[in-house]
Amino acid sequence: MALFRKRQNVPDEKEADRESGHRDNDETKARLKRGTRTRRITIGVVSFFYLLAIIFLILVEIGSIKRQPILRNIYIFKLDLSNILPQSAPSGLSLQNSVAKTLGLHDFYQVGLWSFCEGYNDQGITHCSKPDAAFWFNPVKIILDELLSGASIALPSEINDILNILRIAYHIMFGFFLGGLILDGVLLVISPIVLFSRWWSLPVGILSGISALVVVVGAILGTVIAYIFRAALNSQPDLGVQASIGTEMIAFQWAAAGFNLLAFLIHAGLGCCCTSRRDLRTGRKGGRAAQQTASPAS
C-alpha cells in the first residue's frame, strides 16, 4: 500500500518541477524585460527617427515628377522666364500673355531630382518630363530646343562652367539621397538587433554613420546647387530670368539629414549605455545592477 502511494506521488513531483520551471522562466523573462526597458525605448525612438527620415527622403526623391498637388510644390529651384529679354525675335510673332510664351518658351521650369516640370503662370504646370535616374537639368539645352526659329537669347558666357559643376554635383546628390534612403530602410529593419548585445551597436552604428554622412552631404549639395544657380541667374538683370529656391525641398532634405544624425548619435551611445540582454545574462556592467534591483521585485 505504501509502495502504491509512493508511485502515486511521482507524477505530482514532476508536475511541481514543471510548474517551478515555468515560474523561473517567467521570472527570467520579466527580469529581462525590466532590465532592458530603457534600451528598448531608445531603440524604438531610433526606429521612429529612421521612419521619419525615410518619409522625407521619399518626398525629396519624388518631388516634381508629376503634377499632383503635393509633388508639384517640391523642387530644388525654379526658373521664371516670363519676362525674359530676347536678343532677337522673328518677325510676325503674335504677342502672347508673356514674353516667354511669345518666344515659344514656357513661363517657368521647376527642377526635381528625377525630372523637371514646366508650365505657364495662367495655367500652372502643363508637363513633367519622364523620370530618369541619369537626369540633370540643363537650362541652355531646354531653352534652345523650345525657342522659336529666328529668336535668340544672350546667355552669360560663364553659364557653361556652372553647368559642368551642376551636372557632377547633381549626380552625386542623387546617388547620395538614393543610397541614404536604402540604408535607412535597412537600418529600420535591423536596429532592434542591438537590444540583444552592445556588440551589435558597433556594426549597426557604423552603418548608421555612413547613412547620416551620405544624407548630410546630399543635403549640402542640394542647398549649394540651389543657391549657386539662383545667384548666377539673378546676377544677370539683362537676361530677365529670375530663379527661386524650393524651400520645401530644402527643408525636407535637412529634416532627413537631422533625423539621420540623431539616430547615429543614439546608436553610438547604445554602444556604452543602456543595459542589453547579454549584460543581464552575464552580469556585466549595468546588467549586475539591473539583476540586483529586479530580484527583490520578483
Give the location of each predicted region:
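Short, well-structured alpha-helical interface segments that form or flank functional binding sites
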Residues: 112, 171, 198-201, 247
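Juxtamembrane membrane-interface segments at transmembrane-helix boundaries in membrane proteins
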Residues: 32-34, 158-173, 236-251
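Intrinsically disordered, low-complexity terminal tails of fungal membrane proteins
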Residues: 1-40, 274-298
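Terminal transmembrane helical module of multi-pass membrane proteins
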Residues: 221-224, 228-231, 235-297
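Cytosolic juxtamembrane regulatory segments of membrane proteins
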Residues: 73-85, 207, 211, 279-289
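A surface-exposed beta-alpha-beta supersecondary segment
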Residues: 57-60, 71-169
